[in-house]
Amino acid sequence: MNKAKFLEVISGGLIVSCQALPGEPFYTEEGGLMPYFALAAKNAGAVGIRANSVRDIKEIKEKVSLPIIGIIKRDYPPEEPFITATMREVDELVAIGVEVIALDCTLRKRHDGLSINTFIEKVKKKYPQQLLMADISTFEEGKNAYQAGVDFVGTTLSGYTKESKKQNGPDMKLIKQLVQENICVIAEGKIHTPEQARQIKKLGVAGIVVGGAITRPQEIAKRFVDALNKEEKDV
């Protein structure tokens, strides 16, 4: 799928992130659960899926035919980047045919010792037809990655790095800044409500990814519990 077709497919719609990590209730060593989240998303009208790991992506592709933004989360301590952080992960994702590969494009020190610009250059040289999405946390990171040649910039990591401001909702300021620079933005990160998604859509983004607010029941339940506990304390 080329960039124009992907943009056409996701335009105005919802991409649902279907992920579960070790230690979370919906993670199992055997797999098998994420495809049903993806199927539910498809049945609700979602236009795309974001998913983690070769296993989950393969299983999801058997259930739905929606385009997939694929990632592989793999830790490389002491370095912080862990989302498709090396060529090893890129190779694995290309091999299973995901439409878009998302990768950490922050300016933090990397396990492979490369600058993010050099890494992007190497990926594009090896896989010139592969669509790439930059997961970033700041305007500087987003602009840098886009100029380096990625197809889309995602606000995925805003609030999750030392370089970005912690907040409870989506980083509207960052989204606006990137859009105003004519960067192709896929908004993602802490989008908790349909109204927030509607507001983001009006900013002119290329796409919107929602994850925890849909596919992580433990997080959803905790927001309700925290709100109720706060109300009791306020009385």
Swiss-Prot record:
One of its GO terms (biological process) is carbohydrate metabolic process. It comes from the Bacteria. Pfam families: NanE (PF04131). GO terms for cellular component: cytosol. This is Putative N-acetylmannosamine-6-phosphate 2-epimerase. It catalyses: an N-acyl-D-glucosamine 6-phosphate = an N-acyl-D-mannosamine 6-phosphate. It comes from Enterococcus faecalis (strain ATCC 700802 / V583). The keyword Nucleotide-binding does not apply.
